[in-house]
């Protein structure tokens, strides 16, 4: 017997590790094939998206497809990703991280509203896979942003305006899912 369980009390699931992006991704498989197939599909998509995103980011930064292929393979299949995929689908779903960084770099180097909107959308996707992912990518993204901003003193105002657009897009996309936590 324990005094730590209270039957009949309500507990909010707002702070539970929901993964709206994985839910929407796997929903068709869930409806047609069941829970196991949906989980397997979401897990497989996490590996594919991680490899593809890292490939594109590395190709953008280095310009070499061979190095990009290696980076995509290593990023997608490093041991921590396998371990997380066994028990924490939300934490194993980090494939949108390199896509966010890719669009941030593209938006800084060749500013356009479209690039900043994609940057904001991919940051939001990171958050919708797992709020942890949004928090984990911020320090590296801010460091990369600062380096790129420092290299382009003439474009700083334009870049900061674009980053504000990206932040607003990310907030607008995430707000309906985060509202219960506020």
Q: Each predicted region: which residue ranges?
A:
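Aromatic-rich transmembrane-lumenal/periplasmic boundary elements in polytopic membrane proteins
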Residues: 1-2, 170-182
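Transmembrane helix irregularities
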Residues: 32, 61, 77, 81, ...
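Membrane-interface transmembrane helices that cradle and orient dolichyl/undecaprenyl
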Residues: 100-117, 123-126, 147, 151
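Specific aromatic-rich, kink-prone transmembrane helix
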Residues: 53, 94-110, 140-142
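Perimembrane helix-loop-helix junctions
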Residues: 136-170, 180
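Membrane-interface coil-to-helix junctions
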Residues: 1-50, 76-94, 98
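Transmembrane-helix signature of polytopic, membrane-embedded enzymes
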Residues: 55-77
């Amino acid at each position: 017997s324990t005094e730590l369980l209270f039957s009949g009390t309500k507990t909010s699931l707002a702070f539970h590790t929901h993964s709206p992006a994985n839910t929407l991704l796997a929903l068709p498989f869930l409806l047609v094939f069941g829970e196991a197939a949906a989980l397997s599909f979401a897990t497989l998509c996490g590996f594919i998206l991680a490899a593809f995103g890292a490939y594109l980011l590395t190709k953008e930064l280095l310009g070499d497809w061979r190095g990009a292929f290696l980076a995509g393979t290593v990023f997608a299949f490093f041991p921590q990703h396998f371990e997380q995929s066994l028990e924490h689908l939300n934490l194993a779903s980090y494939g949108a991280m390199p896509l966010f960084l890719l669009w941030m770099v593209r938006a800084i180097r060749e500013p356009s509203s479209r690039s900043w909107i994609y940057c904001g959308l991919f940051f939001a996707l990171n958050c919708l896979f797992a709020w942890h992912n949004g928090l984990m990518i911020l320090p590296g993204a801010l460091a990369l942003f600062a380096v790129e901003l420092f290299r382009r003193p003439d474009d700083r105002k334009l870049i900061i305006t674009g980053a504000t657009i990206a932040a607003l897009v990310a907030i607008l996309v995430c707000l309906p899912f985060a509202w219960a936590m506020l």
